[in-house]
Design a protein with these regions (language model features):
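Residue-level signal for inorganic ion chemistry
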Residues: 67, 88, 103, 206, ...
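ALDH superfamily catalytic-core signature
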Residues: 227-232, 254-256, 260, 267-417, ...
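Glycine-rich loop-to-alpha-helix module at the N-terminal edge of alpha/beta enzyme cores
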Residues: 53-55, 59-61, 66-160, 450
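Rossmann-like NAD(P) dinucleotide-binding subdomain of oxidoreductase/dehydrogenase enzymes
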Residues: 127, 145-146, 154-310
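Hydrophobic face of amphipathic alpha-helices that form TPR/SEL1-like repeat modules
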Residues: 1-70
């Protein structure tokens, strides 16, 4: 059979649609939302390519409209996790022997299906199941997931081209082989794209996976599997199971063929996973790969020269998009007293224009938090701030779960820099501001550095480039920094 050195198609980012009033995509998406709301979906597990139903039904309800029944999924147990492992290991020999070009073609096809005929269905499923507005859904479950599938192929191509130099008369070669066993993908609710990428990336590289999605993102996970199957993914390569985390962990982490975990979620859960793997290390055929991303206590730091309007925009957009349910969302801000009154005024103006409500109304910028547990955690934090002598709720603070899990975007002013909401992740639409003495920039930067164990994202605002360089150096271990220099 003729062979060749195959060149990939040109890989580019998926364009984002606007969903502006009167646009065809807006009309199509609204129609898809109405269609999904008119039915009660049956959502089975997918093991070895087959739909698995247990009859133990769990309701799927929109977080913003929890009286509406959107669908029901079939709850599994330990036996289904074992079935998924068995199916993955059965599929492994054929999958890992498949040419990389064929594996790449499957995921490129999946990206095209996602961005094409499945686009609005995926948006609608994510919007309804996870309470995302149209724009937040579009950039996540369509554009970012398509980018993951496509750029993973590009990255795989580049990895395979990483080959050693050879001495005269010798041809050295590196073979990038899959892991010995199966990969466990444990995925979050807040990004459909991450949920699809965590099993998708290892599968692309020839691995087989057991995938347990968040119980609040089962609906979109099932649709991802439907797309992958249509794209040609062989049965058993990725197996989708719905069960509790501890149930899955008991089976997965005690199995001799456990080869790796791909995780996004809370820091404490990841710590527990790591400890369990260490405890069981003698059981495994190989050393499991542990890949994970956890929480953040992401900050905004403005120096005395910063532009108040820009800082206010960063606060509102950085803290409240998707209800602050992003590990990269801003949740604490350090603002000097000389610009704080102006910043607060701009924030008040911006937040007065923010609408809170269901995703079906495209003018709602903020929707519901994911579930009752999240609602209770956030409302308790607001109540505690209202009662504390060390903090004050200065904007927002209202909440209501009568129809959906709605938390009004809220800003707390902390009078002490170590107030609890300056340190601990809440994962919701609450940002805490500490107003500091403009003469104590360095001291406040030191407080910022030592206040939280998290180091994910941060933003520094200044009109002085030298200040930005100095602050960036001092905070380089606190986050993946972004700096903002106002040139006007």
């Amino acid at each position: 059979m003729p062979k060749g050195v195959f060149k990939l198609p040109n890989i580019t980012n998926e364009p984002i649609k606007s969903y502006a009033p009167g646009s065809p995509e807006r009309k199509e998406l609204k129609s898809q939302i109405n269609q999904l709301r008119s039915i009660v979906a049956d959502v089975p597990m997918i093991i070895d390519g087959k739909e698995v139903r247990t009859g133990k039904l769990v309701d799927i309800r929109p977080p913003h409209d929890h009286h509406h029944l959107l669908g029901q999924y079939h709850q599994g147990d330990a036996s289904h996790v074992q079935m998924a492992i068995d199916a993955a290991l059965k599929a492994k020999p054929a999958w890992e022997k498949m040419n990389w070009e064929s594996r790449a073609a499957i995921f490129l096809k999946a990206a095209d299906l996602l961005a094409g005929p499945y686009r609005q269905r995926m948006n609608a499923v994510t919007m309804l199941g996870q309470s995302k507005n149209a724009f937040q859904a579009e950039i996540d479950c369509v554009a970012e997931l398509a980018d993951f599938f496509r750029f993973n192929v590009k990255n795989m191509y580049e990895i395979y081209h990483m080959q050693p130099n050879s001495a005269p008369g010798i041809w050295n070669r590196t073979v990038w082989r899959p892991l010995e066993g199966f990969v466990f993908a444990l995925t979050p609710f807040n990004f459909t794209s991450i949920a699809g990428n965590l099993p998708g990336a290892p599968a692309l590289m020839g691995n087989v996976c057991v995938w347990k999605p968040s119980k609040t993102a089962v609906y979109s996970a099932h649709l991802i599997m439907e797309i992958l199957k249509e794209a040609g993914l062989p049965d058993g390569v990725i197996n989708l199971v719905y069960c509790s985390g501890p149930t899955a962990a008991d089976v997965v982490f005690s199995h001799k063929d456990f080869a790796g975990i791909h995780f996004t979620g809370s820091t404490q859960v990841f710590n527990n996973i790591w400890a369990t793997i260490v405890k069981n290390i003698d059981k495994y055929r190989s050393y499991p790969r542990i890949v994970g991303e956890t929480g953040g206590k992401d900050y905004i730091f403005a120096d005395p020269t910063a532009c108040p309007k820009e800082v206010a925009t960063a606060i509102v957009r950085g803290a409240f998009e998707y209800q602050g349910q992003k590990c990269s969302a801003a949740s604490r801000a350090y603002i000097p007293a000389n610009i704080w009154p102006e910043v607060e005024n701009y924030v008040q103006e911006d937040m007065a224009n923010i609408k809170v409500g269901g995703v079906e109304d495209f003018t709602n910028f903020v929707n519901a938090v994911i579930d009752e547990a999240s609602f209770m955690k956030l409302s308790n934090a607001i109540d505690a701030a209202n009662k504390s002598a060390d903090a004050e709720v200065i904007i927002g603070g209202h909440y209501d779960m009568s129809a959906g899990y709605f938390i009004q975007p809220t800003i707390i002013q902390a009078f002490k820099p170590d107030y609890i909401t300056m340190r601990e992740e809440l994962f919701g639409p609450i940002l805490t501001v500490y107003v500091y003495d403009p003469e104590k920039v360095d001291e406040t930067l030191d407080i910022l550095d030592k206040s939280s164990a998290y180091a994910l994202t941060g933003a520094i605002f200044s009109k002085n480039r030298a200040n930005i360089e100095e602050m960036t150096r001092s905070e380089e271990h606190t986050s993946e920094l972004q700096s903002h220099l106002n040139l006007v």
